[in-house]
Amino acid sequence: MILKFKFLGSILLLIGLWGCTSGDDIIDYSQDLEISDPAPGSTPGFNKDRNVYFGDLHVHTKHSFDAYIFGTTATPDDAYDYAKGGSIKHALGYDMQLREPLDFYAVTDHGFLLGSVPDWADPNNGKAGTEPFHNLNIPENLNQESVAARSVLFQSYVRNIANFSNIWTRTVAYVTGDTARGSTLYDVDVHRTAWKDVIQSAQRHNDPGNFTTFVAYEYTSSTARSSNTEGAAPLKCLLTGAGCNFEGSPPHEGGNLHRNVIYKGNKFTVEPFTRLKSLNPEDLWSWMDELRENGVDTLAIPHNSNGSNGQMFEMENWDGLPIASQYAEFRMRNEPL
């Protein structure tokens, strides 16, 4: 029994050490900017009570796993150029252009495994298990005939994203309640480099008074999608690999709890808060509260709530307890829309 508790203590200690490299350090990009924020009301014709502005706060580029798998090679810079009226190539090769440029825009790539799939597509990446992705989006593979194969690859990606290579990774995934922690293909340097690209691109294209950009990303959480209703896969499944069903379930069991997280100002974390840290949106809000105390303001906007199977606006919290005024204040502070 003593040995058992020592083993559990070691697991919890190592998980705690894992958390120490959370990427919550804050970087101030103010010195990198050549422009300053305009004075209030300096936008030509500005009227806060009468003007309507049009934009998009949900945009994926090649840094998002789903977009890249289905042929998107556009960068954040490409996306912002498109929003300002430029043309952009569709994955099938034809040009697209807006009739009129937008007023505001935010690239919101999935924070989860941000930038990973383009890295896997490089045949020289040296990462075992990425072979199906090699050369995925080279020109000769970007055609309509590849759609079916890409769909199969995407489904395989979803099924195998938790690659439980040993008991340790399976145990960590079980204790944290997040199967994605078992992935052996997560490269923190690739992740942070892609996030830095998202930040710097938004900063480059921000033109106060004419075109407003926001540094942002998508927090991609979801609820349990197996016959287990407690929210985490059974230990037997994680340790043996038997009977696991993480991606498919009756529609009333699983749901998407995605949020677009928008930053204000010029200070940003080294990496975004993702489902690798917690599937619980309330943990996202706590992280946002902590950032606010350190001078970084953020806003979360529920996304695709119709895909949550009614769980985006439950009358109970993540732990199944009835919501109260404290919960309402907590959520409204971070997610007022």
Per-region residue spans from a language model:
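Extended, charged catalytic domains and RNA/DNA-binding interfaces, predominantly
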Residues: 21-337
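Bacterial N-terminal signal peptides that target proteins for export
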Residues: 1-8
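C-terminal motif of bacterial Sec signal peptides marking the signal peptidase cleavage site
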Residues: 17-19
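Short amphipathic alpha-helical "recognition" segments used for binding
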Residues: 8-10, 113
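Sec-dependent N-terminal signal peptides of Gram-positive bacterial secreted proteins and lipoproteins
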Residues: 11-15
